Amino acid sequence: MSIKLLRYHIIESIKFLASDGNIQLSYYPEFVCKGDEIANLLGDWLLLYQEKTVLENNDIFSQKELMQIISLDNDISMLPPEEFSDYAITHSDKWIDIREKAKKILLSLNEKYSTPDIWSI
């Protein structure tokens, strides 16, 4: 996977995290723990990004941008278990804060919010 394609996946993941909770939940079938899937999404892409940039020495995010993205992922990782229910994803103030932070990150990356590409996340 090219580093540019990886950047695209990360941006789409941030768009997904900026989306309304009902939109987020609609992406997943009923038989999965949707909260867990949402929580792992950005982190999985970040792991691949960090591995790829170390191997290729080719960053496409500035250090400041990368720290903002990692901070967003950390905020999600620090949520208590009760925040991963479908109800919490759509109603919790903590998820509202995560969505707002994701929107701010998109702006800082000169990206506009749009419906995320389902096939890229």
Label each residue range with its predicted role.
Residues 1-49:
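Short terminal alpha-helical segments
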Residues 110-121:
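Structured alpha-helical bundle/scaffold domains in large eukaryotic membrane-trafficking regulators
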